[in-house]
Amino acid sequence: MNIQALLSEKVSQAMIAAGAPADCEPQVRQSAKVQFGDYQANGMMAVAKKLGMAPRQLAEQVLTHLDLSGIASKVEIAGPGFINIFLEPAFLAEQVQQALTSDRLGVSQPTRQTIVVDYSAPNVAKEMHVGHLRSTIIGDAAVRTLEFLGHHVIRANHVGDWGTQFGMLIAWLEKQQQENAGDMALADLEGFYRDAKKHYDEDETFAERARNYVVKLQSGDTYFREMWRKLVDITMTQNQITYDRLNVTLTRDDVMGESLYNPMLPGIVADLKAKGLAVESEGATVVFLDEFKNKEGDPMGVIIQKKDGGYLYTTTDIACAKYRYETLHADRVLYYIDSRQHQHLMQAWTIVRKAGYVPDSVPLEHHMFGMMLGKDGKPFKTRTGGTVKLADLLDEALERARRLVAEKNPDMPADELEKLANAVGIGAVKYADLSKNRTTDYIFDWDNMLAFEGNTAPYMQYAYTRVLSVFRKADIDEQALASAPVIISEDREAQLAARLLQFEETLTVVAREGTPHVMCAYLYDVAGLFSGFYEHCPILSAENDAVRNSRLKLAQLTAKTLKLGLDTLGIETVERM
């Protein structure tokens, strides 16, 4: 259940009855402090101004029409006109009981949409590096959340699998008589790529051959297509190993590389010309956009076809958006691409809208993110200043977690230790990123992310096992517990119950904004509230069976919420630590 939505509807009806316009916003929010109740309606200020009355006067009139019987134990006006709402313990108890009867913990399903999520997007013939981490794991958390809510989600891995680099690579492989790319590891291909680029820059004969090979590849020549396909296959096979290690849901079936849109590009350029949006300028085909200005203050020109006939990333992105609407039938498209690409995407989408390829009713959303930085505040690099390979980062995470787990569990069997180290190490890397607001840069710090205190994966995983340990210690009759009533009589019980029942509200925010850090903060809060509840409200030594069973049910909902919440983030839970 979404209590915030329920209260918003009730307060809105009362505001309208008090004379507010039909489109008034009640602005019901979760209260920041317990003394302000569980929820606060802050919409009186804006509406009172429109009505020409004092906000407190409007709030008083709203209260005369507000019926929250059976939901709130107390409703009061605070300050200039805020309405504080304190939830009824019996209502909380009833909702906890309801949540425990469903695998979804009472979370309702919104209207089902088809949502395309563009994320990860590594380049072919290059190993994934830390720069791919944020897009991959933030995008995957969004996918998991949207799917849990019941949407039809299409994962789109926009792989860089087209362009002049393939002419270079094939030409260099051929020169080295190593055409059988299937026998090569990706690390070899990276070395070949560097050598090919060096020769391309320094040897005009080689560069000319590479350009010719690109033309042959683009024209569909069988030999060159086969070589290209091998390069793609090797890359994606290697990347799949990384995806599996990261516990993300991407597979080979989700690859929708740049090459997919290639056949659409000539038609798009012709159509934009026919619509008068694109014009010839100095031999190139350009769209001038009034929405963007150059240094002189004139409309900015966006090239969609070069003088030599080649296409640009913008052209591909126009085709991509068109395809996602017309072919995939998207109701919404989310792009997890770093913030440096924002203007480029905005320009492509402006052209898309002007051309009528995607209607305004279908949102195209750039869920941008900042950079991963080292402790020195500079982009995260190796000690020698090189790019950190993602596989190396995960290896180090596993090794550090292995030492940490072995230190705390010296007698743990090797296979169990390895499984636990993997959950802790990979979870730590992912959670450290996901727990930060994606729009900002963040400092990558091994010590912080592997700590058992604070908002970290190890702490959250431990918090989950701590709740489970209560059930291991208790001799529980599952059927008796299922039929036992929930009784909320202590403040800490009420606070924990109210927060647990805000799970759906949290999921809704993550789904709408693409901000997994909101889920991390929520789960950390739940873990903290359970800790206080556990300390002050004895469970196994409760004064009677009714209280004991009720508190066990609160613990049960806590465990289920932590597990399900961490699952939406792609963080593995463990039974023991």
Swiss-Prot record:
One of its GO terms (cellular component) is cytoplasm. A motif ('HIGH' region) lies at residues 124-132. It is found in: Cytoplasm. CDD domains: Anticodon_Ia_Arg, ArgRS_core. Disulfide bonds: none annotated. GO terms for molecular function: arginine-tRNA ligase activity; ATP binding. InterPro entries: aa-tRNA-synth_I_CS, Arg-tRNA-ligase, Arg-tRNA-synth_N, Arg-tRNA-synth_N_sf, ArgRS_core, DALR_anticod-bd, Rossmann-like_a/b/a_fold, tRNAsynth_Ia_anticodon-bd. One of its GO terms (biological process) is arginyl-tRNA aminoacylation. Its EC number is 6.1.1.19. It catalyses: tRNA(Arg) + L-arginine + ATP = L-arginyl-tRNA(Arg) + AMP + diphosphate. Keywords: Aminoacyl-tRNA synthetase, ATP-binding, Cytoplasm, Ligase, Nucleotide-binding, Protein biosynthesis. PROSITE patterns: AA_TRNA_LIGASE_I (PS00178). SUPFAM superfamilies: Anticodon-binding domain of a subclass of class I aminoacyl-tRNA synthetases, Arginyl-tRNA synthetase (ArgRS), N-terminal 'additional' domain, Nucleotidylyl transferase. Monomer. PANTHER family: ARGININE--TRNA LIGASE, CYTOPLASMIC, ARGINYL-TRNA SYNTHETASE. Belongs to the class-I aminoacyl-tRNA synthetase family. This is Arginine--tRNA ligase. It comes from Salmonella typhi. The gene is argS.
